[in-house]
Amino acid sequence: MEQADADAFALLALIRQLGVASSAQLQAATGRSQPTLSRLLRALAAQVVVLGSGRSTRYGLPQPLLGAPAVQPLRWVMPDGRLHDWGRLTFLAGDRVHVQADGLDSLNQGSLPWFMAPLRAQGFLGRVLARQWAQRGLDANPDRWSLEQVLATALLLHDAPGALVLGEPPAGSVMPPATGTAPDLDALADEVASTLPAGSSAGGEQAKFLTHDETGHPLIVKFTPPLDTPFGERWHDLLQAEALALQVLAEWGVPVAAAQVLQTARRAYLVSRRFDRLPGGGRLHAVPLDAVHGAFVPGGRQHWGATCRELERQRRLPPGAGAQAEALLHFGRLIGNTDMHFGNLSLWVQPQEVPRGRFSGLAPVYDMLPMRWRPDMAQGLVDIEPFEPDAVALGSPAREVALQFWQQLAALPAASRALRRAAQAMALRLQRG
């Protein structure tokens, strides 16, 4: 082996060991001068990628994304529908992701950067997609995908939540042709249900699909099992409660995902307008609180209020956002929502604020319903019984809002008798305090 080849081989091995390295780091490790190192790097231009610019320039080894190029454009769909060339992503050896954008030089190992969290296939829709992509050798559970697999599939997710698009977007719409009328809803629900194993709900998440209304506005639609089954009847009740909870919150001035319940002879549907989509193909970017906490908040996850108050203290959220999150938490506890995990609250972020890690506020409320009565595949149906309200939440301003919810649910003709009875009992408990 000639000396030049040996030097190049040694330099590649060193960069692989370090993951990414600056010129100064490589000079110190090899003992080579800057001109010599520059000549070696030029000779390795096909194997080494340059990251950043100026004094922040570093070098890494690109790693293809399941055959796709390691370097991919990151585009931001603006509110008016324009596609903005926002940044560049490079997947590197050692499970590293580098993102460069205006004012941003981000390097993560083993995970996506926080602002790309919406591009990860997850939840019910993610599991449905994973089953569709099984022929590509992917695990049926996207939670078990490698980072390379997550990024490779993100190249295909051009209708993912939020405004970021990885790779080249396809020409034309990727939305299904249905318009959200009752017959279309049944057909779409049957199509989704047919992809799942018998008795499965894809990991326990609420079954749902994407479509659009007659004006072309994107929708996300939850659907029940067949109504002539115990689980179908229970989910019908829960979707009615969810629609009412959002309606009550909206009456109190809280931004919510606008939703309504539609029912056919076979199923019930909660049809929600996607709040991250705008007329004319425009989009907005909302990031789950889980990803934001992981990036900026030290320590474990307590609850929405604690995390948002800390983000407000760091001046990443505007004043009052922490109190808003805490009020939603109290409302949820008072209506029996036992599923307020950190993926069920999101924060708005503008493209120019990503480098600073600042957020413009809480995104509209979604998935707010009495999940304590959710049917369970293992345990079956739990009885719809009144419960003891959370003492802290009971002493908060959310009590009045929750009382209105229970009173209206108790009088809701579409709810079952059992749900109306429990709602009436809960209203009395909240009145008594």
Regions found by a protein language model. Give the residues of each.
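Phosphate/dinucleotide-binding and metal-coordinating scaffold of catalytic cores
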Residues: 1-433
